[in-house]
A protein has these predicted regions:
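Structural recognition of the beta-strand scaffold that forms the well-ordered cores
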Residues: 82-87, 91-93, 144-149, 219-223, ...
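C-terminal "exit" segments of structured domains
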Residues: 25, 69-77, 289-415
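Ser/Thr-rich, Pro/Gly/Ala-heavy low-complexity intrinsically disordered linkers and tails
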Residues: 17-67, 71-74
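VWA/integrin I-like adhesion module and closely mimicked acidic/polar interface patches used
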Residues: 44, 49, 54-62, 97, ...
Length: 415
């Protein structure tokens, strides 16, 4: 894969607030955060980092080292993500050029014994199945996923819901897999504008239901191996309007095509770059002209080049792309909202506690490498988890984070 997208931020929202009694909160301040003592002068730690257990077995309670001074605790959760996938089911995904099957573009299909299938289709189908299986295995109440497959041997109207956006439990994962399974195979053209226009409406009209909360981020993922057979500019205009609309929709572009292909009739990297730029997900400093003639820098979109690769190799690339997108929209930013009963808050008396889905509490130290930091040391509005702490939060979707107010901040000195 040519690049790893970074830099798209999304927040989390305050879901529950609980006052926990009196302690060592800051008195007499004139603002939400009164400045206090710089965190570096507070309870410093020279332990390893997140999860080392050194006086960090968190939570507010009788056995908790924070219980004697904590004044309030605010539970936070990630901002939910509503993701709609648009998947290319056109004939070229099956190695068909409109007249003939292209030599070297098809392989024996493990899902359909005795049939040769386009290696791009085998790869994308199997990668998406792995993505769905992972979501099912680690249920994430902050992520809902739906899908629209355009063209194919079982075509559905772009103005209709295909696989509805929903929490990915066993039933949803099964529905997503079934939409890609034999006897469904690639067929026909690439009506990408029609697909984008119709499915933006589907995404924006999504109403979350339990366990998916409201207030989420709208994400469109467009995957194609060709150029539109309907309206190229319309695709770009639609994504740009969605990015500027209400609700805002950010769009990722995943291109599966060779750089030396004819950009007028087969595959155009510049078009894919424009989709990413219009959708608000092009990495800063990317090369919008990245392609066969100019491979300097990185492409603005997710570029997967099949070339002479096998379906298994293309699958690895595509799965990395879809997981990178998931990682990008998954937040490690937590808002610092004043809890009820907290009084004035000193930023040097704030701690972050992570509770795993198994119930283990860990007080995360303030540390820019593997702990957490403020967005502003004097007037913070949020904390951001880094390194090990962020990885732990993302790896345990059902874990919880609490902002504990009133106790001297546990600080870890980076060595």
């Amino acid at each position: 894969m040519a690049r790893w997208l970074t830099g798209v931020a999304c927040g989390v929202f305050l879901s529950a607030v609980t006052a926990v009694g009196q302690g060592c909160g800051s008195e007499g301040a004139t603002s939400l955060f009164d400045g206090g003592t710089p965190a570096a002068e507070q309870g410093e730690s020279d332990g390893r980092n997140f999860g080392d257990g050194a006086n960090r077995d968190g939570g507010v309670g009788s056995t908790d080292p924070l219980s004697s001074c904590a004044t309030a605790s605010a539970e936070t959760n990630r901002t939910p993500v509503y993701m709609q996938l648009i998947i290319d089911g056109s004939g070229s995904m099956d190695g068909f050029d409109g007249t003939n099957y292209i030599a070297g573009e098809r392989e024996p299909d493990p899902a359909s014994p005795g049939r040769l299938t386009g290696k791009k289709w085998i790869a994308v189908r199997d990668a998406l199945n792995a993505f769905f299986a992972d979501l099912e295995a680690k249920p994430d109440p902050s992520m809902a996923v739906g899908m629209y497959l355009f063209s194919s041997t079982v075509q559905k109207s772009a103005s209709k819901v295909d696989v509805p956006i929903a929490f990915v439990d066993a039933a949803q994962a099964s529905a997503l897999r079934a939409r890609l399974a034999p006897p469904i195979f690639p067929n026909s053209g690439t009506p990408l504008y029609t697909a984008i226009n119709g499915q933006l409406s589907t995404l924006k009209s999504y109403t979350p239901s339990a366990p998916i909360p409201a207030g989420g981020k709208y994400v469109l993922v467009v995957m194609t191996d060709g150029i539109p057979t309907d309206d190229t500019q319309g695709c770009i205009t639609a994504l740009d309007a969605a990015k500027k609309g209400n609700p805002e929709v950010i769009s990722f572009a995943v291109g599966v095509g060779n750089e030396d292909a004819d950009p007028a009739t087969v595959y155009d990297e510049a078009f894919m770059a424009k989709l990413a730029q219009a959708g608000g997900t092009a990495v800063p400093g990317c090369n919008p002209n990245w392609g066969n003639a100019d491979k300097s820098g990185t492409p603005c979109h997710f570029q997967i080049t099949p070339g002479t690769k096998t379906a298994a190799q293309i699958r690895t690339d595509f799965l990395a792309a879809i997981n990178a997108i998931r990682d990008t929209v998954t937040s490690c930013e937590l808002p610092l909202v004043k809890p009820a009963g907290a009084g004035q808050i000193d930023p040097a008396n704030v701690n972050v506690v992570f509770t795993s889905s198994s119930g283990t509490d860990t007080t995360i130290p303030q540390n820019a490498k593997d702990g957490w930091t403020y967005d502003s040391p004097t007037n913070p509005t949020k904390v951001t988890l880094h390194g090990d702490a962020c990885d732990a939060l993302k790896a345990d979707p059902q874990g919880k984070v609490r902002i504990v107010i009133g106790c001297k901040t546990v600080v870890e000195v980076t060595k």
